[in-house]
Amino acid sequence: MSGMRILTGSVALGGLTYAIWIIFSPGEERKKEILKSLPEANPVRMEETRKRNAIMLQVLKDAAETNDNIARGFGSQK
């Protein structure tokens, strides 16, 4: 009987979790509104992000190609 109680409790908990998920998930209109407000929806912002990522990638490539510790060069110069 203990196994049946655990099984019933697990199924009930799974059903409750699913019901709460359905109740609190956003509808189609809310999903569209959320997608419109994401930063990726703004073309200007996306272009800025692409440029920033390209600069960071170039810095990482330069750092990988050198044997110097470039992190020490940005601190106080002695």
Swiss-Prot record:
Residues 27-78 are mitochondrial intermembrane. GO terms for cellular component: mitochondrial inner membrane. Signal peptide: none annotated. It holds the Pfam family UQCC3. The keyword Mitochondrion applies. Its main location: mitochondrion. GO terms for molecular function: cardiolipin binding; phosphatidic acid binding. GO terms for biological process: ATP biosynthetic process; cristae formation; mitochondrial electron transport, ubiquinol to cytochrome c; mitochondrial respiratory chain complex III assembly. The chain crosses the membrane at residues 6-26. It is found in: Mitochondrion inner membrane. It comes from the Eukaryota. It is a single-pass membrane protein. Keywords: ATP synthesis, Membrane, Mitochondrion, Mitochondrion inner membrane, Transmembrane, Transmembrane helix. Residues 1-5 are mitochondrial matrix. Required for the assembly of the ubiquinol-cytochrome c reductase complex (mitochondrial respiratory chain complex III or cytochrome b-c1 complex), mediating cytochrome b recruitment and probably stabilization within the complex. Thereby, plays an important role in ATP production by mitochondria. Cardiolipin-binding protein, it may also control the cardiolipin composition of mitochondria membranes and their morphology. Associates with the ubiquinol-cytochrome c reductase complex (mitochondrial respiratory chain complex III or cytochrome b-c1 complex). Belongs to the UQCC3 family. This is Ubiquinol-cytochrome-c reductase complex assembly factor 3. The lineage of its organism: Eukaryota, Metazoa, Chordata, Craniata, Vertebrata. The gene is uqcc3.
